[in-house]
From Swiss-Prot:
Belongs to the NAC-alpha family. Pfam families: NAC, UBA_HYPK. The lineage of its organism: Eukaryota, Fungi, Dikarya, Ascomycota, Saccharomycotina. InterPro entries: EGD2/NACA0like, NAC-like_UBA, NAC_A/B_dom_sf, Nas_poly-pep-assoc_cplx_dom, UBA-like_sf. Its main location: cytoplasm. This is Nascent polypeptide-associated complex subunit alpha. The keyword Cytoplasm applies. Residues 14-78 form the NAC-A/B domain. It is found in: Cytoplasm; Nucleus.
Amino acid sequence: MAEIPEGANVTILNRNEKKARELISKLGLKKVPGIIRVTFRKKDNQIFAIEKPEVFRSVGGNYVVFGEAKVDNFTQRLAAAQQQAQSQTATKTPEDIQADMQAAAVANENKTEGDAAEEDVDAGDLSNDDIDLVVQQTNATKGQAIKALKEHNGDIVNAIMSLSK
């Protein structure tokens, strides 16, 4: 018997799986590369997951999946993620929290100064109703609404669309 080198990836197939693979090769199924995980969901939201599956596809669009199916407990993974997020926020010191709050306040002040500069835009021949409509629909500032209306020659729809992007 030949020796298997260290670090080699060896898969031992049972008898039923060997037979199934032989039948698949006779049916002409094509192997689908690049699939990392397959999940199946039942009506009661129970999830079965197959990690590193071998997936084959028939001409008609049906799939055959080989691999070890495990019951995936989504609630446990969600609880672990929440616990990890809480531990990350708990590690902040009061000084870090104060620094974050001051940085947010400075950013907010800079934003309001920029908004005040935009308010000085000349409305020209645009009606206040058109400007107010664009502001209401897009939650933009009055200056942004006037600028968009001028860019689109007073077309309200195009101004709203440009600000909604």
